[in-house]
Amino acid sequence: MNDVAIVKEGWLHKRGEYIKTWRPRYFLLKNDGTFIGYKERPQDLEQRESPLNNFSVAQCQLMKTERPRPNTFIIRCLQWTTVIERTFHVETPEEREEWTTAIQTVADGLKRQEEETMDFRSGSPGENSGAEEMEVSLAKPKHRVTMNDFEYLKLLGKGTFGKVILVKEKATGRYYAMKILKKEVIVAKDEVAHTLTENRVLQNSRHPFLTALKYSFQTHDRLCFVMEYANGGELFFHLSRERVFSEDRARFYGAEIVSALDYLHSEKEVVYRDLKLENLMLDKDGHIKITDFGLCKEGIKDGATMKTFCGTPEYLAPEVLEDNDYGRAVDWWGLGVVMYEMMCGRLPFYNQDHEKLFELILMEEIRFPRTLSPEAKSLLSGLLKKDPKQRLGGGSEDAKEIMQHRFFASIVWQDVYEKKLSPPFKPQVTSETDTRYFDEEFTAQMITITPPDQDDSMEGVDSERRPHFPQFSYSASATA
């Protein structure tokens, strides 16, 4: 019954996600939903264990189209925490029909199995998934937090999905950053899973260089994260002003980032995946705070890989562009890019034309300013290796390999974690409402928030059961 059998196999043309070329891939569809692709037809078991593409057709939607090529079909499914789309084409309508029928049959079979398992498990809470266990075990806040519990002081930032506002909690007088996301935009842009991931990761993470979550709650049309407020500003803001950081300053920030990523990888089995200067903040004392967990992957162990696309183009690792499976090493590529920016004052690869940019990331050798020390060059060369298996931190030792690099020879890692190192720059903030390190384009704006509806003042059972955002509410004090 548990034997995994191949349902269908053969050649398909697969379209790249970023570099929109069609690549021939030999795909195997298995009855457990696995849909794996290879450059060549695998001849033995060893070759089968290293696929280039690894998808699941569970809960998928299939669409047939004649664009951009005849006999195209698109698979859309939720994978890990993100909705993904993969585009394939074959030579004839008959071939397409065979593939789509086989995929739909496997997906339907898995759905039936899941429904049977759910029936069998009802009344047995110990069998639930980790995410469900976590949500059930969260203590509910005694007082339901709502938008009326805060004063709205200044706009700190604005994006596609919503805004970030400096708020003051009326009951305690404490200051927080409130991230307010519009549900309709999140749903329209397939960001539901990313957003729920951010909520889960923030709830479960306790580390000095990760932004702490105080509360999360929802209204009928918004999701709200009330987070620790780091008013030292974005690292991007400071680097833009100073153009380049000294190696000592870059080493300090780099060490704190490595400490946080090590915690996420080893303690939480999470890959951050979106490391960039804009997601690195400074607190009032000048220590790093990593923000914005919307692109995190959950459940990544050593050797585990993932298949979804997101991230800023300039920071994308080669294995992501190549449309290959990727794992924790993407974070070390991201670290390489941000540390290169800090020490060299520019991105390692840049072109306004995305196709040319991707070509540079995949093919171009890294270049360094003459002023860079041999240790810094060695570190950056290791972190920016194109092959993730050869990359510094790409092996089973993960962060430990980077910690042992000679660039960090002077660093005592326990002292980093305990914040015993003096920050090389202390933000000159005079109060908690001082926003001098935030862009005036935002802070000078009037805050406009549509008043919550009457029924939003109490987040009732119905809102908690909404299909897109179940069990969203959280209070750190209730779980402390």
Curated annotation (Swiss-Prot):
ATP binds at L156, G157, K158, G159, T160, F161, G162, K163, V164, K179. The modification Phosphoserine is found at S124, S129, S473, S477. Residues 5-108 form the PH domain. One of its GO terms (cellular component) is mitochondrial intermembrane space. Residues 150-408 form the Protein kinase domain. Its EC number is 2.7.11.1. It is an enzyme of class 2 (transferase). It is found in: Cytoplasm; Nucleus; Cell membrane; Mitochondrion intermembrane space. The modification Phosphothreonine is found at T308, T448, T450, T479. The record marks D462 as: Cleavage. Residues 409-480 form the AGC-kinase C-terminal domain. The active site is at D274. 1D-myo-inositol 1,3,4,5-tetrakisphosphate binds at K14, R15, G16, E17, Y18, I19, R23, P24, R25, N53, R86. Its main location: cytoplasm. Residues 450-480 are annotated as: Disordered. GO terms for biological process: apoptotic process; cellular response to epidermal growth factor stimulus; cellular response to growth factor stimulus; cellular response to insulin stimulus; glucose metabolic process; glycogen biosynthetic process; negative regulation of cilium assembly; negative regulation of protein localization to lysosome. The modification N6-acetyllysine is found at K14, K20. Belongs to the protein kinase superfamily. AGC Ser/Thr protein kinase family. RAC subfamily. Binding of the PH domain to phosphatidylinositol 3,4,5-trisphosphate (PI(3,4,5)P3) following phosphatidylinositol 3-kinase alpha (PIK3CA) activity results in its targeting to the plasma membrane. PI(3,4,5)P3 is also required for phosphorylation at Thr-308 and subsequent activation. The PH domain mediates interaction with TNK2 and Tyr-176 is also essential for this interaction. This is RAC-alpha serine/threonine-protein kinase. It comes from Bos taurus. The gene is AKT1.
